[in-house]
Amino acid sequence: MNMKNNNLVSSYARALFHVSGSRLGIIRKEVEFLLAFFKDQDVFVYLSHPMVSLLHKKEAILSIKENLSENLVKFIMVTLANKRSRLLILILEKFLNLVRESENELEITIKSAEILKKPDIKIITESLNFLGKIIKVSHVVDPSILGGFVVRYGFNVIDASLKSYLDRLVDLSKMEMLKIRNCI
């Protein structure tokens, strides 16, 4: 996604977040419903197709209106009218990220050199509870980290891998070697 689209997605998602106000929990459930609906049906392809008229797109949304609050329907109509329908899934996903962030919920990815057992994953996630409520844990195996683990959440990384430890040792050794050379 280019920078312009990224800015548009963020702007629309923030607008929906602010409009939701005290109904944030309800809108969140409706957005989750919509995302599941769009991903399981050809509806999104229809809504984002440039040859489909705005009127037909609006009719498609109005057909599921009974499952959505008035504010969300209006938001989608504005999105369609502004010809941003191809960004709708990204906007709704970004909105959910904003909601999770506001409620201090985290999705984490744990990278390890080997497959971790459930008790190991539980220990890691329990030690990270201070960060917020962990709602989803993904596990990735990457033998290149040699040992330990790397945790990613949002834009943050906790690197407790053997590879990073060894890399730091190499860097420290190089610095000490330079100090010794400069002193001689």
Swiss-Prot record:
Topology in the lipid bilayer: Peripheral membrane protein
Under the heading PROSITE patterns, the entry gives: ATPASE_DELTA
Pfam families, A to Z:
OSCP
Instruction: Give the CC-aspect GO terms.
Output: plasma membrane; proton-transporting ATP synthase complex
- InterPro entries, from UniProt? ATP_synth_OSCP/delta_N_sf, ATPase_OSCP/d_CS, ATPase_OSCP/dsu
GO MF: proton-transporting ATP synthase activity, rotational mechanism
Q: Which residues form the signal peptide?
A: none
Q: What's the superkingdom here? A: Bacteria
The protein's location, in the record's own words, is: Cell membrane
Which keywords fit this entry according to its UniProt record? ATP synthesis, Cell membrane, CF(1), Hydrogen ion transport, Ion transport, Membrane, Transport
Task: Please state which protein family the record places this protein in.
Answer: Belongs to the ATPase delta chain family.
- Report quaternary structure and partners: F-type ATPases have 2 components, F(1) - the catalytic core - and F(0) - the membrane proton channel. F(1) has five subunits: alpha(3), beta(3), gamma(1), delta(1), epsilon(1). F(0) has three main subunits: a(1), b(2) and c(10-14). The alpha and beta chains form an alternating ring which encloses part of the gamma chain. F(1) is attached to F(0) by a central stalk formed by the gamma and epsilon chains, while a peripheral stalk is formed by the delta and b chains.
Free-text function comment from the UniProt entry: F(1)F(0) ATP synthase produces ATP from ADP in the presence of a proton or sodium gradient. F-type ATPases consist of two structural domains, F(1) containing the extramembraneous catalytic core and F(0) containing the membrane proton channel, linked together by a central stalk and a peripheral stalk. During catalysis, ATP synthesis in the catalytic domain of F(1) is coupled via a rotary mechanism of the central stalk subunits to proton translocation.
How is this protein named in the record?
Answer: ATP synthase subunit delta
Q: Which organism is it from?
A: Wolbachia pipientis subsp. Culex pipiens (strain wPip)
* Phylogenetic lineage: Bacteria, Pseudomonadati, Pseudomonadota, Alphaproteobacteria, Rickettsiales
Q: Which gene encodes it?
A: atpH
